[in-house]
Swiss-Prot record:
It catalyses: 3-amino-2-oxopropyl phosphate + 1-deoxy-D-xylulose 5-phosphate = pyridoxine 5'-phosphate + phosphate + 2 H2O + H(+). One of its GO terms (biological process) is pyridoxine biosynthetic process. It comes from Christiangramia forsetii (strain DSM 17595 / CGMCC 1.15422 / KT0803) (Gramella forsetii). 1-deoxy-D-xylulose 5-phosphate binds at residues 45, 50, 100. This is Pyridoxine 5'-phosphate synthase. The active site is at residues 43, 70, 190.
Length: 237
């Protein structure tokens, strides 16, 4: 079964909007785990506009499921990950002023850099994943870095699927097969939702994990957090 890791950045965004500690990120994460999620994801950025570096440090000891920290591997981020030692680190090529992640790595151009960073994480017992577009060349490049997994960037699928284009899943299915043949595990994330997750999961083989945040938290405003997570788990079976 494909695992569900819930990205809690939006909970931190809500907290930060008023200052203080409501909603409490740690309590939210523990509730999400109790509702059945198999992992917690955070994506700290240098400006700490949602998840703070301190949140990542405080979350690790209270979590009972896999902890995944995403981010651009600047030195501050690398130091955080090596200190916290999550189950998984996902490397994302965040642009300076981007509101959210908007592209995968060029794993050919940045191969040597990624290889060096990944080796350090793996030496510390941390599973590694690289955020990539569904492009064969980028999947092959990811394998050459020594990464354990890839995370397929799914925005283009979500946008096209919303427009009625069910063929939007084909590049992802093809890249998942290539990744599997190269010995890579397969994660996916970005704009996956209750509307499209089942179709994506049913058509993309070897899918180990999905990381979902914005859509899940938005849907929870209407359905409640527990019910929303339960619906995702049902669709991912």
């Amino acid at each position: 079964m494909t695992k569900l890791s819930v990205n809690i950045n939006k909970i931190a965004t809500l907290r930060n909007a008023r200052g203080g500690d409501v909603p409490n990120v740690l309590e939210a994460a523990k509730n999400i785990e109790s509702f059945g999620a198999e992992g917690i994801t955070v994506h700290p950025r240098p400006d700490e506009r949602h998840i703070r570096y301190a949140d990542a440090r405080e979350l690790k000891p209270v979590l009972n499921t896999e902890f995944n920290i995403e981010g651009k591997p600047i030195q501050q981020f690398i130091d955080l990950v090596l200190e916290v030692k999550p189950a998984q680190v996902t490397l994302v090529p965040d642009a300076e002023n981007a509101i959210t992640s908007d592209s995968g790595w060029d794993t050919v151009k940045h191969r040597d850099y990624l290889k060096e960073v990944i080796a350090e994480f793996k030496a510390n017992g941390i599973r590694t994943s690289i955020f990539v577009d569904p492009v064969k060349k980028m999947i092959e490049g990811a394998a050459e870095t020594g990464s354990d997994r890839i995370e397929l960037y799914t925005e283009s699928f979500a946008v096209d699927f919303e427009k009625g284009n069910s063929n939007a899943v084909k590049p992802y299915a093809e890249c998942a097969k290539i990744a599997h043949e190269l010995g890579l595990g397969i994660n996916a994330g970005h704009d996956l939702s209750l509307k499209n997750i089942n179709y994506f999961k049913e058509n993309v083989p070897y899918l180990d994990e999905v990381s979902i945040g914005h859509a899940l938290i938005s849907e929870a405003l209407y359905l409640g957090l527990e019910k929303t997570i339960q619906q995702y788990l049902k669709l991912l079976k």
